[in-house]
Swiss-Prot record:
Gene3D superfamilies: Naphthalene 1,2-dioxygenase Alpha Subunit, Chain A, domain 1, Rieske [2Fe-2S] iron-sulphur domain. Residues 120-227 form the Rieske domain. This is Choline monooxygenase, chloroplastic. The gene is CMO. Its cofactor is [2Fe-2S] cluster; Fe cation; Mg(2+). One of its GO terms (cellular component) is chloroplast stroma. Keywords: 2Fe-2S, Chloroplast, Iron, Iron-sulfur, Magnesium, Metal-binding, Monooxygenase, Oxidoreductase, Plastid, Stress response, Transit peptide.
Length: 439
């Protein structure tokens, strides 16, 4: 449990600049602003999480149902499918949602509109834009976004699309004084304003106010940068509460830790619907003794506790006192908070990990895992590498499970399943939230 040496840190942080369109916090381009704005950054730095102030910055037993087909993708057919799951049925008697929730392209599109384009979604971490003129890019569904901090320190978010001919404006992350479109050379300030329309004549009267980048709502909450397409969100609201409800303080107590330092990112593409991973995460470790043999030795399952609070499920479990190899990764207790629909914050031992599942299609997603560790452990290269290796292996095992479930859902043999209570109460709660959000 120590801080990694410079060489160890460099070795740990050699990862791609983007992860499924989401920026890698370990990459940073500090080239001169006069360089090509859209060159993919190559330099890497080790971001920290020193700024933890919750700063708010906002811009502008029933019979198995029969399931309808979405061959004709009308709003009524989608809603019919949404209502095939009834949240009023007690979980002991209920069937799980129909397999079509996990396979139909039209249902996936409906999820993007009703879930991912509403409320707050994690876009990146605050250290990516801790300095003026830093920026990063990413994607959410078919939305390409750009987050920047201008020269005066204000944070902005925009659709990453040039207002001239719809070219993607920037890529990767880094530090620049302006954004230059790679197509026709239009120039935008770090605040999204149009600074120059190349070769445009003054008599055309192109209005810079009308041709600036299209803004998104943005907020910084502790280590997380969040964005929103939701126009119903009020300016200046309590971002933590809007995102996490009454669980915000509990999550804040674990995640807003100034001793934590970002050290590594892992990514796991998988051929499965994003909800399969969410379901897997929320089963109160029901699958762990069968699928994760080493991980099972780290936990005392008799102490497992699951609480569902609004749009968050929190799981707590004590670490096992009998560790076969003597390696203590989990510590006294593990805390797992899963914020619906797709983001988890975990604290255990000296670690914090975040798990972000990115929907990429009805049958495809990517898991991005960010690792943080307490400063006192940064020099312990062996501990860090072993801890990351153990957790990465757990995720690879879960990828196999999720892809297997997706294949099973695609077969004509399966329409829906049943819940095993109370261990799967977290999954049932998530499904109820989905139905209420989608209807």
């Amino acid at each position: 449990m120590m801080a990694a040496s410079a060489s160890a840190t460099t070795m740990l942080l050699k990862y791609p600049t983007t992860v499924c369109g989401i920026p890698n916090p370990s990459s940073n381009n500090n080239n001169d602003p006069s360089n090509n704005i859209v060159s993919i950054p190559q330099n890497t730095t080790n971001p920290t999480l020193k700024s933890r102030t919750p700063n708010k910055i906002t811009t502008n037993a029933v019979a198995a149902p029969s399931f309808p087909s979405l061959t004709t993708t009308t709003p009524s057919s989608i809603q019919s499918l949404v209502h095939e799951f009834d949240p009023q049925i007690p979980p002991e008697d209920a069937h799980t949602p129909p397999s079509s929730w996990y396979t139909e392209p039209a249902f996936y599109s409906h999820e993007l509109e009703r879930i991912f384009y509403k409320g707050w979604q994690v876009a990146g971490i605050s250290d990516q834009i801790k300095e003026p003129n830093q920026y990063f890019t990413g994607s959410l569904g078919n939305v390409e976004y750009l987050v920047s901090r201008d020269g005066e320190g204000k944070v902005h978010a925009f659709h990453n699309v040039c207002t001239h001919r719809a070219s993607i404006l920037a890529c990767g992350s880094g530090k620049k004084s302006c954004f230059v479109c790679p197509y026709h050379g239009w120039v935008y300030g770090m605040d999204g304003s149009l600074a120059k329309a190349s070769k445009a004549k003054p008599e055309q009267n192109l209005d810079p106010k009308e041709l600036g980048l299209v803004p998104l709502k943005v907020a910084v909450w502790g280590p997380f940068v969040l964005i929103s397409l939701d126009r119903s969100l009020e300016e200046g609201g309590d971002v933590g509460t809007e995102w996490l409800g009454t669980s915000a303080e509990d999550v804040k107590a674990h995640a807003f830790d100034p001793s934590l330092q970002f050290i590594h990112r892992s990514e796991f593409p998988m051929e499965s619907n994003w909800k399969i991973f969410s379901d897997n995460y929320l089963d109160s470790s029901y699958h762990v003794p069968y699928a994760h043999k080493y991980y099972a030795t780290e936990l005392n399952f008799d102490t497992y506790d699951t609480q569902m609070i609004e749009n968050v499920t929190i799981q707590r479990v004590e670490g096992s006192s009998n560790k076969p190899d003597g390696f203590d990764r989990v510590g006294i207790q593990a805390f797992y908070a899963f914020a619906y629909p797709n983001f988890a914050v975990e604290r255990y031992g000296p670690w914090m990990t975040t798990m972000h599942i990115h929907p990429l299609g009805p049958r495809k997603c990517k898991l991005v895992v960010d690792y943080y560790i307490e400063n006192s452990m940064l020099d312990d290269k062996d501990y860090i590498e072993k801890g990351i290796a153990i957790n990465d292996n757990v995720q690879r095992e879960d990828v196999v499970l999720c892809e297997s479930v997706q294949r099973g859902l695609e077969t004509p043999a399966y329409r829906s399943g049943r819940y095993v209570m109370p261990i799967e109460k977290g999954i049932h709660h998530f499904h109820c939230w989905l139905q209420q959000t989608l209807k």
